[in-house]
């Protein structure tokens, strides 16, 4: 199994994380990883994948934000697993609440990504969806209730049962699949709460990308792993 970083930062489509800003954030993640010894994952926009890989690909885990259920060929605007591999990325997110997929498409693309050797992280909105995601045997399932995303209210505190239950059901169907906690994670105490509930790590976004000092924000998050 490929290693799943305990902290993954999704850049989304924030202007603070596109182009030169994406490279700046990527360097911050690399610095923090080197200083703390904690593996960090980052998910830059597709247009910045190759540049980010060239900049910090040897220092952090670089993932795409999404991949489409499409094969190479006449698929205008689609992103295939092969394209992500060719860009040099290590893996991808799938089925984020802002980029939902039909279950049949998710099954196909998850299998294709794993076959291509990509670290594959499937997002799920609740424990029921987490179980379905775990049944696909991805490297990780990230539990993110959509109503909490971007609110600053962490799921680990707002609804701890969904984290505990998700860990339980994912491990029932795929023991080696890691479980990440997302939605509203902003500081080290949120991370600590998630880990205490059984999560293997966290998936974050605005808490780092939009922070006044992204490096300090990331260091604070990592402190919750101690």
UniProtKB/Swiss-Prot annotation:
The gene is tpiA. Disulfide bonds: none annotated. It comes from Methanopyrus kandleri (strain AV19 / DSM 6324 / JCM 9639 / NBRC 100938). GO terms for molecular function: triose-phosphate isomerase activity. Belongs to the triosephosphate isomerase family. Substrate binds at residues 10-12, 149, 184, 205-206. The keyword rRNA processing does not apply. It is found in: Cytoplasm. It holds the Pfam family TIM. The active site is at 96 (electrophile), 144 (proton acceptor). Coiled coil: none annotated. This is Triosephosphate isomerase. PANTHER family: TRIOSEPHOSPHATE ISOMERASE. Its EC number is 5.3.1.1. Gene3D superfamilies: Aldolase class I (3.20.20.70). Pathway: Carbohydrate biosynthesis; gluconeogenesis; Carbohydrate degradation; glycolysis; D-glyceraldehyde 3-phosphate from glycerone phosphate: step 1/1. GO terms for biological process: gluconeogenesis; glyceraldehyde-3-phosphate biosynthetic process; glycerol catabolic process; glycolytic process. Involved in the gluconeogenesis. Catalyzes stereospecifically the conversion of dihydroxyacetone phosphate (DHAP) to D-glyceraldehyde-3-phosphate (G3P). It comes from the Archaea. Homotetramer; dimer of dimers.
